[in-house]
Amino acid sequence: MDKIRIGIVGYGNIGKGVEKAIARNEDMELTAVFTRRDPASVKIATETAVVKTMEDMKSMKGEIDVMVLCGGSATDLPVMGPQIAADFNTIDSFDTHARIPEYFENVDKAAKAGGNVGIISVGWDPGMFSLNRLYAESILVQGSTYTFWGKASARDTLMRSAGSRE
């Protein structure tokens, strides 16, 4: 069986977590990590994968089956999502709820033009938490749905605030 060849775009906490998840799945292999940093400064755990600049991405076309986009929803994904979906199958965790329809339209248009598939907003919320709410609401149709998400509660928003640090 051929393994699914994965590329990771962005190697922060999410990218590192994706690398660990890939290592635990026998049907996948990490092929490359793409970064805006100097590739020599990025140390990954997967010895068989390479680290490349974002500019080198297109040279890997045909060698990667799926790109996992690990950028932030505020500024990274709105730009990189459609750009990368034009050349690769992509999956991301875009989570700016109010902008999902616009983001979907942009990624879908680019992916279709390139003969690719772009799967968006597959994270905690939207994503796993959304599915949990859907299941609960289908059973408890008269119930009330509450979330702990609200204005400025997203980590991305908090980390961009003055005085925030890891």
Range-by-range predicted roles:
Residues F94-G118:
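Rossmann-fold NAD(P)-binding glycine/threonine-rich loop
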Residues I6-I8, L69:
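Hydrophobic Val/Ile/Leu positions in short beta-strands of Rossmann-like dinucleotide-binding domains
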Residues A49-D56:
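Short acidic-hydrophobic, aromatic-tinged amphipathic segments that line or gate anion-handling sites
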Residues R24-A45:
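NAD(P)-binding Rossmann-fold cofactor-contacting core
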Residues W124-D125, F129-E166:
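Conserved anion/nucleotide-ligand pocket segment
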Residues M57-V66, A74-S93:
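Rossmann-fold NAD(P) dinucleotide-binding segment
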Residues G15-K16:
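N-terminal Rossmann-fold NAD(P) dinucleotide-binding loop
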Residues Y11:
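Glycine-rich Rossmann-fold phosphate-binding loop(s) that bind the pyrophosphate
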